[in-house]
UniProtKB/Swiss-Prot annotation:
Keywords: Kelch repeat, Repeat. It comes from Arabidopsis thaliana (Mouse-ear cress). This is F-box/kelch-repeat protein At3g44120. Residues 1-46 form the F-box domain. The lineage of its organism: Eukaryota, Viridiplantae, Streptophyta, Embryophyta, Tracheophyta. Coiled coil: none annotated.
Amino acid sequence: MTLPELPKDLVEEILCFVPATSLKRLRSSCKEWNRLFKDDKRFARKHIEKAAKQFQPLTLTKNYRICPINVNLHGTTPSLEVKNEVSLVDPHSKNSAAQFNIDRVFHCDGLLLCTSQKDSRFVVWNPLTGVTKWIELGDRYNEGMAFILGYDNKSCNKSYKAMSFNYLDKDSEIYEFSSDSWRVIDDIIKPPHYMDYFRECFSLKGNTYWLGIDRRRRPPDLRITLIKFDFGTERFGYVSLPPPCQVHGFEASNLSVVGDEKLSVLVQGGSTSKTEVWVTSKIGEANVVSWSKVLSLYPKPDVGFWHGLSFLLDEEKKVVLCCKSKGWMEEEDEENVYSVGEDTKFILLNFGVQTIGGYSPIIVNYVPSLGQIELAGSKRKRDY
């Protein structure tokens, strides 16, 4: 008996609910599906809206490579495993097998913006589809530059933008993917805060968030602020923080994302070892963001929370994976991560590899998607 052929619209509707990584395995089974997954913007938008999200933590190794991390929080003993490196071939190298050396990575909507130390270009890469877009910086490049990626979340046609920051210049520039061009936004008013553009920024719903320290204040009067850059209005703004962050003086403050809908903050007071983890309501559902406390921790003296350390929160299980601080004089061969939950018991997990940076692992919460990169007039390459 021959199975009836389903209508095309029904097939697409069914595929919209299939997880992104499963679609990758289906590409080779049908040429039409392969085209649909790689090139159809309409289907990509529907899939991002409807499919169940898969969260895949990534890390950067000391060899400037990206590695996925498998995290298991089930059972009595949490564990993690660093998987094999993900390949990103450098098309500008004379060696066809040469890899692009990645020293910083920024995640937005399933796309990774990757930069390389002292390299006058960056790449935006979708690891799921293999599509890349290389952006040359030319004369605008200097070693003090950092980049973020985003989009106007109020527009029905998602058009990505990259923004450059330059410590040596007050001006910032926007790169438009749709026109393959740069423009200066010289009327932008930057907040009077110190922001670590390299490590402490996160994308959520197309916008970028940082924790900043007001440059106008001096210890012990320091206070942290949550800063937002809106890619739709191309303006900075502020988001309220939970009560512990509003007091004067603190030992450490760190930001992270929860899934693809919430922000979380880890803050340690300056006069006590007590550390709290707070999480926002769903970003974008209301004009005012509300916070709720998820965990209160009392770390041992040898468990330090430095500014900029990576952490991941499993809100449902109330478990935090937090990277271990490593002092400048420590000579450990491998990095470590702590797992801690409501019982405040810190479990040391061996990371298994040396990571970039030298003193603490970097963890990126990556969400695979069919997010498509506009390629107006630029070269692209697919890695299969």
